[in-house]
Amino acid sequence: MLGLLSTQSVNNAKQRGGRIMDAKQLKDLQSLPLKYKIMISQERIREWYEHWDGQVYVSFSGGKDSTVLLHIVRELYPDVPAVFVDTGLEYPEIRRFVKKHENVVWLKPRMNFKRVIEKYGYPVISKEQSQFLFEIKTGSSEKLRKIRLEGNKYGRGKVSERWKYLIKSPFPISHKCCEVMKKSPFARYEKETGNKPYIGVMASESSMREIDYIKNGGCNFYETSRVKSWPIGFWNDSDIWEYLNIFNVPYCSVYDMGY
């Protein structure tokens, strides 16, 4: 369990008219049948669209999750643009799949992958584990280091036991790759256009995303440093595949190759 939200978080949610979420409520949402999840996601999408007067976009990676999200959004609002960041690291099949879609804005990072790893270090395992390893190897806070090694009082937020040997790796490790190559291009696009993102991430993907989802009261994040909407944030991986099959939505062929 993630524990209760702080009093300040609850008060902030009340003041902005937002939803207050806890771990049990998230689990309840995650256990709903798909048809109800679709209805809730559609409502969150409408709320976001109306709040920003239609100045929105879908963050589109070509992966199955963002493919489902794009399909749901465009069933409601066909003219919403999709935005794809071409990092140069994508499978050729992903690039071909993205090109099949209309109204997609292509962005590029200002720094290539080689330069990123030279400057910041290698992304390993996952973004979350890379961040934890980075903070252990480079951080100055002993309190944070202890959490990353042993976990918080709920046992969360630590490097997995199987990856602790990487603490002594001879090469630098960092989570900065995603920030430089993916997040920065999106941030520039948002600043230039004023458009706010729908993002196809799910709380079930990592403990950090679960914490973010709960802390911010659900799908639509209005008070974070980067405002964003996670309309399928309470879905599970099985829901994605069920949606693709039920609605016969084409998805990238890399998934049929075992990736």
Give the residues covered by each predicted segment.
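ATP-dependent adenylation/nucleotidyltransferase module used to activate substrates
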Residues: 14, 19-239
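Mid-to-C-terminal catalytic subdomains of enzymes
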Residues: 231-259
